[in-house]
Amino acid sequence: MHALIIDDSRAMRSILRRIVTELGFETLEAGNGQEALDHLESGTVPALCLIDWNMPVMDGYTFVTKVRENPDWRDVTLMMVTTESEHGQIVRALAAGAHEYVIKPFTPDAIVDKLELLGLVRDGVAA
């Protein structure tokens, strides 16, 4: 099972990569929403996208809306992982099609718990 980590911070991508690889996911990475969209358009469709909101070129919100416009990608689970903590931003992301929302800073358990709720992880392993 693949996870696409979308964040302009290499350090954050590394943190998220460590968390999801320990769960058994294979990872792909993108530094912005456009790079992530290019992965999807090339035929590499992951089970999960972990998405930052604030990125250059294409932000996470725009990425979510574009993914939801394409019926071929309807099964991709989208989880925002961002510093945007205003209630309105959270509602906006979920209304656009994100499944979950985690606010930075976070603990690894926060990510694992959300993935368990989404059915992507069972007993600490990718389902």
Question: How should each PLM-predicted stretch be described?
Answer:
Residues 30-34, 90, 108:
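Conserved Asp/Asn-Gly motif in the active-site loop of CheY-like receiver
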Residues 55:
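Receiver (REC) domain active-site loop signature in two-component systems and cognate sites
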Residues 29-48:
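Acidic, metal-coordinating helix/loop segments flanking the phosphotransfer/catalytic sites
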Residues 99:
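Short, glycine/charged-rich "phosphate-handling" switch motifs in NTP-dependent
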Residues 14-22:
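Charged docking surfaces used in two-component/phosphorelay signaling
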Residues 106-115:
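C-terminal output helix
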